[in-house]
Design a protein with these regions (language model features):
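Charged, glycine-rich active-site and insertion segments that engage polyanionic ligands
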Residues: 1-82, 86, 90-160
Length: 160
């Protein structure tokens, strides 16, 4: 229903409406904020971030933290929300509940590959770390410090 509303009433293209609907999780107000914000490529940003974390490429994580710091608060929140949603999708994939997955296309391909290296314990720990980072961001902590700290902790979690 929300996706149809965004397409019909707001004139948003189908692929973008699907992404917004997935992020908003039924919250119309949040979906409208996402629709009004500039198009950002959370999927690509997340994929690059997780690859750097998995490879423990700490040198590339510093510029990523600087880029994250340069985003506005809504974009930072959107990336964290997106990251948490991908962890959820990965958990569903590992659990065999693929009929509940909302991902499509390249995002689904990444989740299929990502689920091969993730375990329930890694997802639980990553989810907790991301929620903690989101909490600190909401309390106006330094986005660069929070993102870099989260990245290092995720690198240790994903590839111990």
């Amino acid at each position: 229903e929300l996706e149809a509303f965004l397409i019909n009433q707001r004139g948003i293209e189908v692929a973008r409406a699907a992404k917004i609907t997935s992020l908003a999780e039924g919250n119309v107000n949040y979906a409208l904020k996402l629709a009004e914000s500039d198009e950002d490529d959370n999927a690509q940003r997340f994929i690059e971030w997780m690859r750097a974390c998995f490879k423990k490429n700490y040198i590339s994580l510093v510029p990523m933290a600087e880029d994250y710091h340069a985003l506005d608060k809504l974009q930072q929140k959107n990336l964290m929300t997106y990251s948490i949603n991908v962890m959820r999708e990965t958990l569903l994939r590992i659990s065999g509940a693929t009929d509940m997955n909302r991902s499509r296309g390249d995002e689904l391909k990444f989740i299929q590959d990502f689920s091969k290296v993730m375990t329930l314990e890694k997802i639980e720990k990553s989810f907790t770390l991301m929620n903690d980072a989101n909490y600190h961001l909401e309390r106006n902590g330094s986005a660069k410090m929070i993102f870099l700290d989260l990245s290092i902790k995720l690198a240790r979690t994903i590839n111990p």
